[in-house]
Amino acid sequence: MTNASRDEERLRLALREEPDLAPLLAVLDETIRVLDENGVEYLLMGGIASSCLGRERWTHDIDLFTRPAEAARVLKTLAAEGFETEETYPEWLFKARKDAQLVDVIFRSGGNTTVDDEMLRRAPTVPFMGRLVRTVPPEDLVVIKAIVAAEHTPRHWYDALAIIAATELDWEYLLRRARQGVRRILSLLLYAQSNDLPAPSWVIRDLLSLLEGA
């Protein structure tokens, strides 16, 4: 690439318009409405939850988290409202689409994490761009993102750090959830502590003890 081409690319990026979120938000509102009206249990995760609990960032889809036994009902409920649906990966993920917007129906996440009663009890209701949404608890989101973070998805790592920085976490609860990914959580918290984020030393010691007892 020539210097002129690089300058043109920098200018293009500098002038780039913010993405139009109106179509995504319209489908989000419809998804929430129809699931709530039908009494379907679900939580929001992914970029929307990360924006609510940690740092604002753009997202291109809607990530729902539901019980494995509830996933087919979520899909059926959305299909009845005109969503296109597919059982993409029967082990962990279904998909729905409407007006070119994607809804991921996740029922098994990193570390074999699934929705349970305690997660639903702890789920916060938080504002997101003018509406209220119910998200995965921040502690669970930190654990999930630490486990699924990879070289090609560094956003998960930085989402988790942002949640640690922005949210008062229940560390006892996080420790219970961390048993499915002790090494990942430990590495995240050590990195967080090295950057002066509020990662308690006693939590790190307890994670080390879990490793030693494994």
Can you name each region flagged by the protein language model?
Residues 1-214:
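Compositionally biased terminal segments of proteins
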